[in-house]
Amino acid sequence: MTDLSRARYAELFGPTTGDRIRLADTDLLIEITEDRGGGPGLAGDEAVFGGGKVLRESMGQGRATRAEGAPDTVITGVVVVDHWGIIKADVGIRGGRIVALGKAGNPDTMSGVHPDLVVGPSTEIIAGNGKILTAGGIDCHVHFICPQIMDEALGGGITTMIGGGTGPAEGSKATTVTPGSWHTARMLEALDGWPMNIALLGKGNTVSSESMWEQLRGGVSGFKLHEDWGSTPAAIDACLTVADAAGVQVALHSDTLNEAGFVEDTLAAIAGRAIHAYHTEGAGGGHAPDIITVAAHANVLPSSTNPTRPHTVNTLDEHLDMLMVCHHLSPKIPEDLAFAESRIRPSTIAAEDLLHDLGAISMIGSDSQAMGRIGEVVLRTWQTAHVMKRRRGFLAGDNGADNQRVQRYVAKYTICPAVAHGLEDEIGSVEVGKLADLVLWDPAFFGVRPHAVIKGGMIAWAAMGDANASIPTPQPVLPRPMFGAAPKAAAATSVHFVAPHALEDGLADRLDLSRRLVPVANVRSRGKADMPRNDAQPRIEVDPDTFTVRIDGDVWEEQPAAELPMAQRYFLF
């Protein structure tokens, strides 16, 4: 047999163990640590589709029927990037779920074929050779202001949304809340036909426990406490008391003006209970100037929103106007202007960069249309990783490649929000048994534009050329909805996450929904230690006069980035 050079092997079958791949135009490199397809040692047996290729009848394609276990789809020779590792494998999908990561093919003619990856006549092939596969992104901070956010999110690699809203109402523009069972029912119906998993948050700003139980029975997955509705210590305690009894998560936007108390009072009201702290840095809201200190606490699950990711020379200028609009403020009212200015602090925004790189802030969401951009969750995560690589070099354990850093950052918008909100049994990683919510990337466009977004095993969104062309690739190649985005298919491949009490109360019978209703897992005992690769608890101090931030005693100096990757090389605007 003719020997293949590593370069030639990569051209034919994709990279293999020991090969390194640059992510878009960043300084980040990944190195493949394992090739479950056999690599060069089994050259010629790779599962490759096409004319004159392996996956043909009685060659790489066997006789197994679907009833005998053949997968519905195999993604061939793809590099899987997940919090648990960076490997190459064939990925099998059956019934909308991941069934195996290994070697696909025909065991009658090939060695080492995984028993759940036996290619048969019923098997579709997606060529992943030379591409990267990640879990579908989870945006943990979504304002449901307009339905068009779905297209933008899918086009950015997001397949699950956690948040709330009812449309362009003032409450929804400012707060991620779907208040009350009537609004919740209508939103569950409205979102039924989109290729997107949904977890709605109800209003937690009340001391009425029955009001919250009513919302849980109505189909919310948890609660949101927002200062615009009054995040008082009494409301925080009441909401967490109900959440503890129901097993659901609470997301917190605390009191920027410190009217009802300071950060210490909020922490006292939380009383060591699990809570998801939104935009922990504070530009998006929260006790000024030291809300960022909550990221040091074991019971707090901290996240960022993407407008401050990463800290750049333009970050401060755009934030003031955004904030005035989002929170229904007037520049003509001095108190409103002071409120807005108190939230924008370059020192804490700069410290946010470092806390992400340390794994102390565990998640990144968008804050869509409410100071954040829903299509840029993935992109800004990797821009932050790039900026930190330039400033801090390799992380411990990395040498020549950035696997540790990449695994930390991919977890911020996949497994960490899934664990925080009790969704990890269904989504959040590329693992056997989970929904096949997957994003396929060309390495040159990693984090920028997906090659394809697979929702529950079906391609829902993809880069596609002119539909009147003779082949799929002529320009303009644009991200477009595919058959998996059609309403009935989308409902069959997506889920609504709801509180267990909603199912016990018969919500599925009360609403005419096409998709599955899935109960969230009990999250009340979860804390920072449960955030994969993002469980650090450094000491964080903020000077109340100068806003200087010390992390484990050291001042983190502001060095806003003047240039970023994944920007104007890819976008006109």
Swiss-Prot record:
It catalyses: urea + 2 H2O + H(+) = hydrogencarbonate + 2 NH4(+). GO terms for biological process: urea catabolic process. The keyword Hydrolase applies. Its EC number is 3.5.1.5. Its cofactor is Ni cation. PROSITE patterns: UREASE_1, UREASE_2, UREASE_3. Keywords: Cytoplasm, Hydrolase, Metal-binding, Nickel. Binds 2 nickel ions per subunit. Gene3D superfamilies: Metal-dependent hydrolases, Urease, subunit C, domain 1. Pfam families: Amidohydro_1, Urease_alpha. It is an enzyme of class 3 (hydrolase). The keyword Ribonucleoprotein does not apply. Carboxylation allows a single lysine to coordinate two nickel ions. SUPFAM superfamilies: Composite domain of metallo-dependent hydrolases, Metallo-dependent hydrolases. Ni(2+) 2 binds at K224, H253, H279. Belongs to the metallo-dependent hydrolases superfamily. Urease alpha subunit family. This is Urease subunit alpha. The lineage of its organism: Bacteria, Bacillati, Actinomycetota, Actinomycetes, Mycobacteriales. The gene is ureC.
